[in-house]
UniProtKB/Swiss-Prot annotation:
UniProt main location, coarse: mitochondrion
Organism: Schizosaccharomyces pombe (strain 972 / ATCC 24843) (Fission yeast)
CC per GO annotation: mitochondrion
Biased composition (Polar residues): 144-157
Protein name listed in UniProt: Uncharacterized protein P4H10.18c
Region span, Disordered: 68-97, 141-164
Amino acid sequence: MVASLIKRAKATSLRSLFQKNEMNFQSIRFNIHQFSTQPALRSEGSELIFGGRSFDSLLSSIKETMEEKKKKSSSFEKRDKRRVQLKEKSPLRTPRNRTQIIDARSTRKDTENESLRKNNFKRRTQFAFTGRATKSNAGVMDVQSPSTMSTSKNNVRNAERPASKKPVFGSKKYFDVINDSNVENKEETKDRNLDRALSKFTQSREKNEQNLSSKASVLRNKKSILLKKRNQDETQLTTEEDFSANNDSTAKIETSIHDHRDISRITPFELPFVNPKLFASFTPMSVALPAGRLLLIKQLQEKSTQSSSMTGLK
């Protein structure tokens, strides 16, 4: 009984302790197993032992870990506060607007040559004139000072020499020549681009015209073929109408024979109705016919010579 009461009391004290330290009871079990070599829970007399360690030692180790965690969290908070203070003291430099950047890019190319000219003029005049080549003393020579006498003499000698054809590097003429050549090159490139565009346009137009002409010829051929077919159909219809107008069976047989000129296709039933005049120039050896049909044809030839009363046709 006493051991069970001690166990309950210890468990409640553990729960209350970790609830104060903002931890769940599941984490208590994890910590107990972490610090113990034997996870089994047993009691020796009046003390609870967690895996070979007493309850007091286990509590003290857990408290130490909790305090370390608190210290770490406090150090992080201090560091964050320090960062905020530094930001408030020295705020970050705000970037320029995009419009300002674009304006600077557009004006930089225009002012680049001018700035180079000014800098080169200062470099060349810095040795010839006293002091710094500023607006105040630019163009004023200090002849009295011995330090600048040699440079001034050299400049005079250079002035007496004949001017070279090529402009000096960094001089105003040098940059003028470069600018003129750039302008000429730009104009030449524009002309070339225009010529290329015109040539491409003309080529594409010619190709389109060729394609259209070929398509037109194909359509004309199709149209002519259709017209021919239509004419053939019309002629066939007219002949059929003419045949239907004449209801005589003998006329139909005669026209069919006249169209085909093939006596071998005539059936024995049609032979009595055939015009005997068709067989006047007929030779039985010219067409391979059965013996029965040849006899019928011979009979018809004989009848045609005697009289044409059976057919009623002359």
